[in-house]
Amino acid sequence: METVRRKLEHIEICLKKEVVSKYRPFDDLILLHRALPEIDESDVCTECTFLNRRLSAPLIISAMTGGHPDAREINANLATAAQETGIAIGVGSQRAALEHPDLEDTFSVVRELAPDVPVIGNIGAVQLHRYGPEVLDRVAEMVDADAVAVHLNFLQESVQPEGERHAAGVLGSLREARFRLPIIIKETGCGIPFEDARMLVDSGIQLIDVAGTGGTSWSMVESYRAELRGDPESKEIGMLFAEWGIPTPVSVIECSRAGAQVISSGGVRSGIDVARSIALGAFMAGAALPLLAPATRGSVDVVRVLQRFVRELRISMFLTGSRSLQELSRAPVIITGRTREILEQRGIDTKIFSSKR
């Protein structure tokens, strides 16, 4: 039951502790304001198609939880809100339900309450490598998924005393997986660089959720878990690596340049961040932590947050003169600060983003 207990601890820590990166890379991005947008706000359309389903906005409720009885209500509230607002939803790692089938309903409730939006299953890359490609079918069937996310969380595993640090052969397992549904490769707070994105694309993976730094730090979460266990060494190591990784905007640009279809997540805290992500080259954006506390209170609170995100995205599109998401993808964005420094060190000319259209 170690996996089950860990899921509950993760939820409690994320609700009660400061687990967010101190650096907010999205603040380095300035969408060019159009004083004369020459469109009406009513002309703006935020709708898109994702996994063959129509959505009200390019937004995903990112993977959060499941695998503990207390998580069922959270997932139920998230799913109800996703259905009401027309937003996609991902579930947390389904490993616990594979080990304890009586917990499957903590995940399957999502499709039950969100029959019309994309649902994304979730399993770790380590589990895929261990159990083989058939595990993808098992997690997909559990939630009647439209796609399955295979998550990479080797920093988190490295900080956990019980972590699994077997990374050798993961790419080969992904390459050999012949699956009927799209596979999304998803990081968990550390981002994905061009080099890895290129290897993934060359292996047949098209969808990458960068989940970069700037949002929830799972190293920090594990540091708090270590403190609860009375493990001072792991606590210190977790805090040391709290800011480790690639900022989300950098990862979005690098993965886009590698030819991937990019989902931007990691520090997405508003509809403006969604707009910034689209302007950088992502086609979807995901958020998790801003929805966790509302989900403990009820679906109505989650709906309010999602509706606010969509309204903020709409205003951002109006003020950049973008009628559609395609036009928003061509909107100039000025890159400043540490994000600009990293991109330039990586050989990317940031001026190409400020002079678009």
From Swiss-Prot:
<keyword id="KW-0963">Cytoplasm</keyword>
<dbReference type="InterPro" id="IPR000262">
    <property type="entry name" value="FMN-dep_DH"/>
</dbReference>
<dbReference type="GO" id="GO:0070402">
    <property type="term" value="F:NADPH binding"/>
</dbReference>
<keyword id="KW-0288">FMN</keyword>
<feature type="binding site">
    <location>
        <begin position="63"/>
        <end position="65"/>
    </location>
    <ligand>
        <name>FMN</name>
    </ligand>
</feature>
<comment type="subunit">
    <text>Homooctamer. Dimer of tetramers.</text>
</comment>
<dbReference type="GO" id="GO:0000287">
    <property type="term" value="F:magnesium ion binding"/>
</dbReference>
<feature type="binding site">
    <location>
        <position position="156"/>
    </location>
    <ligand>
        <name>substrate</name>
    </ligand>
</feature>
<dbReference type="Pfam" id="PF01070">
    <property type="entry name" value="FMN_dh"/>
</dbReference>
<feature type="binding site">
    <location>
        <position position="93"/>
    </location>
    <ligand>
        <name>FMN</name>
    </ligand>
</feature>
<keyword id="KW-0414">Isoprene biosynthesis</keyword>
<dbReference type="GO" id="GO:0004452">
    <property type="term" value="F:isopentenyl-diphosphate delta-isomerase activity"/>
</dbReference>
<feature type="binding site">
    <location>
        <position position="157"/>
    </location>
    <ligand>
        <name>Mg(2+)</name>
    </ligand>
</feature>
<feature type="binding site">
    <location>
        <begin position="6"/>
        <end position="7"/>
    </location>
    <ligand>
        <name>substrate</name>
    </ligand>
</feature>
<dbReference type="GO" id="GO:0008299">
    <property type="term" value="P:isoprenoid biosynthetic process"/>
</dbReference>
<feature type="binding site">
    <location>
        <begin position="288"/>
        <end position="289"/>
    </location>
    <ligand>
        <name>FMN</name>
    </ligand>
</feature>
<dbReference type="GO" id="GO:0016491">
    <property type="term" value="F:oxidoreductase activity"/>
</dbReference>
<comment type="function">
    <text>Involved in the biosynthesis of isoprenoids. Catalyzes the 1,3-allylic rearrangement of the homoallylic substrate isopentenyl (IPP) to its allylic isomer, dimethylallyl diphosphate (DMAPP).</text>
</comment>
<keyword id="KW-0521">NADP</keyword>
<feature type="binding site">
    <location>
        <begin position="93"/>
        <end position="95"/>
    </location>
    <ligand>
        <name>substrate</name>
    </ligand>
</feature>
<keyword id="KW-0285">Flavoprotein</keyword>
<feature type="binding site">
    <location>
        <begin position="267"/>
        <end position="269"/>
    </location>
    <ligand>
        <name>FMN</name>
    </ligand>
</feature>
<dbReference type="InterPro" id="IPR011179">
    <property type="entry name" value="IPdP_isomerase"/>
</dbReference>
<protein>
    <recommendedName>
        <fullName>Isopentenyl-diphosphate delta-isomerase</fullName>
        <ecNumber>5.3.3.2</ecNumber>
    </recommendedName>
</protein>
<feature type="binding site">
    <location>
        <position position="122"/>
    </location>
    <ligand>
        <name>FMN</name>
    </ligand>
</feature>
<dbReference type="InterPro" id="IPR013785">
    <property type="entry name" value="Aldolase_TIM"/>
</dbReference>
<keyword id="KW-0479">Metal-binding</keyword>
<feature type="binding site">
    <location>
        <position position="62"/>
    </location>
    <ligand>
        <name>FMN</name>
    </ligand>
</feature>
<feature type="binding site">
    <location>
        <position position="216"/>
    </location>
    <ligand>
        <name>FMN</name>
    </ligand>
</feature>
<dbReference type="GO" id="GO:0005737">
    <property type="term" value="C:cytoplasm"/>
</dbReference>
<dbReference type="GO" id="GO:0010181">
    <property type="term" value="F:FMN binding"/>
</dbReference>
<keyword id="KW-0413">Isomerase</keyword>
<feature type="binding site">
    <location>
        <position position="186"/>
    </location>
    <ligand>
        <name>FMN</name>
    </ligand>
</feature>
<comment type="similarity">
    <text>Belongs to the IPP isomerase type 2 family.</text>
</comment>
<keyword id="KW-0460">Magnesium</keyword>
